[in-house]
Regions:
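Conserved, mostly hydrophobic/aromatic
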Residues: 31, 35, 43, 62, ...
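N-terminal beta1-alpha1-beta2 module of alpha/beta enzyme domains
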Residues: 1-71, 166-168
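Hydrophobic faces of well-ordered beta-strands that scaffold small-molecule active sites
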Residues: 3-7, 39-41, 71-73, 101-105, ...
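Flexible, glycine-rich active-site loops centered on histidine and acidic residues
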Residues: 2-19, 79-150, 190-202, 241, ...
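Acidic (Asp/Glu)-rich catalytic clusters
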Residues: 32-33, 59-68, 90-101, 184-185, ...
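An alpha-helical appendage that flanks or caps ligand/catalytic pockets
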Residues: 4, 33, 122-158, 197-302, ...
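Alpha-helix-loop-beta-strand connector modules within alpha/beta enzyme cores
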Residues: 52-73, 127-131, 322-339
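Glycine-rich, proline-tolerant flexible connector loops at the mouths of alpha/beta enzymes
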Residues: 38-62, 77, 194-198, 307-319
Length: 342
């Protein structure tokens, strides 16, 4: 099981963005020093009340700080973009990371974003599938000609190419059955959102693997899930530390139309988070977080992308969580996962 950190790129609009990005650099340096496998980020646009750092430029800046770690996108909203540009930028990220880049893409779900880019939401599936095909070909072929529904290419070659051979992994995100089956067929891996419970992930992972097998494809090494992780000396401290920020994050998800979330507004904040986290997040002491991550692994997750900071959270608390994860959880998860394989 690989263990990475999903970087928070969303910050309150009142915060100084330069300070918040300097804090991100500090986090990445600590993440690298503790031996994590990867760093990840996501993409959104038009986020009222928040800064949201642009994904690909952010990873380009962080590549040098992350030397030796993998970089991943979770995820690029591919229907909003020209796939040729994404192929070029992603290839360059592979070059500057030393061949340690994974391209994660997905449909998107916010109507505001599609309206801003003047892309009809009804076209998002066809744009995604066509875009993945174009990127794959541009990474592995010269003189690509493609005449599809959305994109017309005549004799296109990109340089530089990725340095991974045959190419970087392409992962597709979804939380619905049709999208998971699509990810199994057209991509190398599946990006899992943090919403489903562990039991739901286990069932979805089996369906994903069965779809790949029926298509004559090998098992995937890239089932990557965002997991909300709050590691503290004890569960009560974890709940108190994270509740104001995680609950605001999930309230934003609700406002943006993310399905699958319910929050009991009548409960106290810590109890709201306890209910939301049950069988879904990894929250509590190092031992509790270790057990929760291993439960995700047993459910089929091969790469945990752990989100440890949320909008408005103090840097000292983010760093403390990363430090505790790296010192106490990382080695124990790796040891027990290796034992389970033996």
């Amino acid at each position: 099981m690989k263990l990475g950190i999903y970087l928070n790129a969303q910050h309150p609009a009142a915060d100084d963005p330069a300070r918040r990005f300097a804090e991100t650099i500090e986090q990445v340096r600590l993440i690298r020093s503790l031996g994590f496998d990867s760093i990840w980020g996501g993409e959104h646009h038009i986020t009222p009340g928040f800064h949201y750092f642009p994904l690909l430029p952010m990873l380009q800046r962080l590549a040098a700080e992350a030397d030796g770690m993998w970089l991943g996108t979770n995820l690029v909203l591919l229907p909003l973009h020209n796939p040729v540009e994404i192929a070029e930028v992603a290839a360059f990220l592979d070059v500057i990371s030393g061949g340690r880049f994974m391209l994660g893409v997905g449909l998107g779900y916010r109507t505001e974003e599609f309206a801003m880019f003047r892309v009809p939401m009804k076209e998002r599936v066809s744009r995604l599938t066509e875009g993945v095909e174009i990127i794959r070909r541009l990474w592995t072929e010269d003189h690509v000609t493609h005449h599809g529904r959305h994109w017309q290419l005549d004799d296109v070659t990109i340089r530089p190419r990725p340095i991974q051979r045959p190419r970087p992994p392409i992962l597709v995100g979804s939380q619905v059955d049709a999208g998971i089956a699509r990810a199994a067929r057209i991509a190398d891996g599946w990006l899992v959102v943090p919403i489903p419970t562990v039991d739901e992930i286990a069932a979805q992972s089996k369906a994903y693997a069965a779809t790949r097998a029926s298509a004559g494809l090998p098992p995937s090494d890239h089932v990557c899930r965002i997991i909300e992780v709050v590691c503290a000396p004890d569960e009560d401290t974890a709940l108190r530390r994270a509740a104001p920020f995680l609950l605001e994050k999930y309230a934003a998800y609700l406002a943006w139309g993310m399905p699958g979330i319910t929050i009991d507004k009548n409960a106290a904040p810590e109890e709201q988070l306890r209910q939301l986290a049950k069988n879904r997040f990894a929250l509590g002491s190092p031992a509790q977080v270790t057990d929760a991550l291993l439960a995700q692994h047993r459910a089929g997750v091969t790469h945990a992308t752990m989100r440890v900071g949320w909008p408005g959270m103090a840097q000292k608390d983010v760093l403390a969580g990363i430090e505790l994860l790296g010192r106490e959880v990382l080695p124990e998860v790796r040891r027990r996962a290796a034992q389970a394989r033996a």
